[in-house]
A protein has these predicted regions:
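Nuclease and nuclease-like effector domains acting on nucleic acids or nucleotide cofactors
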Residues: 1-99, 105-169
């Protein structure tokens, strides 16, 4: 993305420079804008976060196929999305699919974007977000730890009023 495009994107979105500078193309930015993502500081990193996750929702009970996958199914049966992220796991959409974290700019220290699978990999987005032929700079083992830490930090970012709304107390 050239300087004029970056300046225009900043004017449109008001995203911080750390996010703008990590975005490689206008097409990439459009994916994040179409998803309605907003900037937030989560832990020690900038991220583009979703506002449409229902933190009170998601019951493992609705997805009985998980009984066969989880040895400790009974532990998770009453967890909602907020509980999941508090444990370091991604929240789930209404279908039970996990939201994904994407490194904006594909560098280890890049800001994250919270995306659905379709936003991340579907409809040609995979080739926009992951440049073909370019070696990934992401250490996958480190990323596994970062994802867990990110979701825990996302939970800690809830305000007391948000927690009351989630848990109805």
């Amino acid at each position: 993305m050239n300087a004029i495009e970056a300046q225009h994107l900043k004017h449109l979105t008001h995203w911080p420079d750390e996010i703008i500078n990590a975005i490689a193309s206008v097409e990439e930015a459009e994916i994040y804008m179409k998803a309605g993502l907003k900037p937030a500081r989560i832990g020690n990193r900038w991220a583009l976060v979703r506002s449409d996750i229902n933190w009170s929702d998601y019951s493992v009970r609705r997805n009985t196929w998980l009984k066969n996958k989880l040895a400790d199914y009974s532990k998770w049966v009453d967890y909602n999305n907020a509980d999941l992220i508090g444990e370091g796991f991604p929240p789930r959409d209404v279908n039970g699919d996990p939201y994904e974290l994407h490194h904006i700019g594909q560098r280890q220290d890049s800001p994250f974007a919270e995306l659905t699978w379709a936003e991340h990999m579907g409809d040609g987005n995979n080739t926009i977000l992951h440049k073909a032929g370019k070696e990934s700079e992401i250490d996958r083992q480190q990323f596994e730890h970062e994802k867990s830490d990110y979701w825990k930090a996302r939970f800690k970012a809830f305000s007391p009023s948000e927690l009351r709304k989630i848990y109805g107390k």
